[in-house]
UniProtKB/Swiss-Prot annotation:
PANTHER family: V-TYPE ATP SYNTHASE SUBUNIT D. Keywords: ATP synthesis, Hydrogen ion transport, Ion transport, Transport. Gene3D superfamilies: 1.10.287.3240. Belongs to the V-ATPase D subunit family. GO terms for biological process: proton motive force-driven plasma membrane ATP synthesis. It comes from the Bacteria. Produces ATP from ADP in the presence of a proton gradient across the membrane. The lineage of its organism: Bacteria, Pseudomonadati, Chlamydiota, Chlamydiia, Chlamydiales. One of its GO terms (molecular function) is proton-transporting ATP synthase activity, rotational mechanism. This is V-type ATP synthase subunit D.
Length: 208
């Protein structure tokens, strides 16, 4: 790309403008990268907590594993509730949209208390907690992934600015400046040479 730039005063001016813009925008990118690093750290912690809650509720379910083989109890759990909707919004965090759960709405249905033991209530409560924690952990992991992807992209851009665009533009400015300086010296030399020849011809003419 840099080899296609013409070594002219106009090209020199354009490269200077380009460098100024790059150097102006780089601090903004670095700030965004720093903010994203903080958000990613928070998202990792949030996802870890949600996953831990999900795994703990899953272990509580496993403690009743044998009971899940009894159709009567399984039917009681299945019929007791279901996820009606997950109220999820997207918030702008350092320029990227991330999901945030506002509410998880469960529809509740009654089951026969007479046909099921009293501890089925506990089993239903554990099942509800398991389902809710599963949804929360999935959204938290999604949020973490989105922020990590954005951080990766911004980091690539920062490296591009620091390692490629700014150095290349700086070198091109220097190259054009040297070329223009050399050409200026050459032009001055040619002017002096032309004047000298004119003077010589004038002197020769006068002598004749």
């Amino acid at each position: 790309m840099s080899s296609q730039v013409k070594l002219t005063k106009n090209a020199y001016r354009l490269e200077k403008v380009k460098l100024s813009r790059l150097e102006t925008y780089l601090p903004t990118l670095k700030l965004k990268k720093a903010l994203l690093q903080v958000e990613v750290t928070n998202a990792i912690r949030e996802a870890s907590e949600c996953i831990q809650a999900y795994e703990e509720s899953r272990e509580s379910i496993y403690a009743f594993a044998e009971l899940y083989s009894v159709p009567l109890y399984v039917d009681a759990i299945v019929n007791s509730f279901k996820i009606e909707r997950v109220e999820k919004e997207y918030e702008n965090v350092t320029g990227v949209e991330v999901p945030v759960i506002k509410n998880i709405v469960l529809t509740e249905s009654s089951y026969s208390v007479l046909d099921t033991p009293i501890w089925v209530d506990t089993l239903v409560a554990y099942s509800r907690e398991f389902v809710v924690n599963k949804v929360r952990s999935e959204v938290a992991v999604e949020k973490q992934r989105i922020l990590e992807d954005e951080l990766r992209n911004v980091s690539i851009r920062v490296n591009l600015f620091e390692k490629k665009l700014i150095p290349e533009t700086t070198r091109m400015i220097k190259k054009i400046a040297i070329f223009l300086s050399d050409r200026s010296i050459t032009d001055v030399g040619q002017v002096k040479m032309a004047k000298k020849k004119i003077q010589q011809r004038k002197e020769e003419s006068e002598c004749a």
